Design a protein with these regions (language model features):
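Conserved ATP-binding subdomain of kinase catalytic cores across diverse folds
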Residues: 1-103
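Short strand-loop-helix active-site module centered on a catalytic nucleophile
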Residues: 55, 141-142
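ATP-dependent phospho-/nucleotidyl transfer catalytic cores
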Residues: 80-141
Length: 142
């Protein structure tokens, strides 16, 4: 499927890969492009697609993903999971606001991650978030 034909949603995203927001039948979707590297395009978009499907097979709620092309490049597309009254906070930003360390020189331990999750004032259900973190970690490691 060619996603180039869809209009912009006006939403913008950060992260390692180039992304853009589009509207499909009035609903916002995220387009994630394959990342360029010195060896050529990476397969991170395929990893996102396969990973999401593995999570769903394991019974863990995950985004629905679709493969296609946009602007002539391979992409993975997913429904935007951010509600109208929500904001997305990347994990590194959570850590930056919680730990007194520079993320460029600091590697998080599991204890650091648990501390961040337990003490973060932005989370509304810490216990569920911690359980979900470990579910995701185990499936991701598998």
């Amino acid at each position: 499927m060619d996603y180039s034909k869809y209009k912009s949603s006006g939403r913008y995203y950060t992260g390692a890969e180039r992304k853009k927001g589009i509207l499909i039948q009035g609903e916002p979707y995220i387009v994630k492009y394959a990342k360029n590297s010195p060896q050529g395009l990476t397969c991170s978009y395929l990893s996102e697609y396969i990973g999401s499907h593995l999570f769903r097979i394991a019974g863990i709620e995950a985004q629905e993903t679709f493969l296609g092309k946009c602007d002539g490049l391979p992409v993975v597309v997913m429904k935007d999971f951010i509600g109208g009254d929500e904001i997305f906070v990347p994990f590194n930003d959570v850590g930056d606001s919680t730990l007194e360390q520079s993320r460029e020189r600091y590697k998080y331990t599991y204890e650091d991650i648990m501390l961040m999750l337990e003490e973060n004032m932005k989370l509304t259900n810490v216990e569920e978030t911690v359980r979900h973190f470990w579910d995701m970690y185990l499936i991701d490691a598998w």
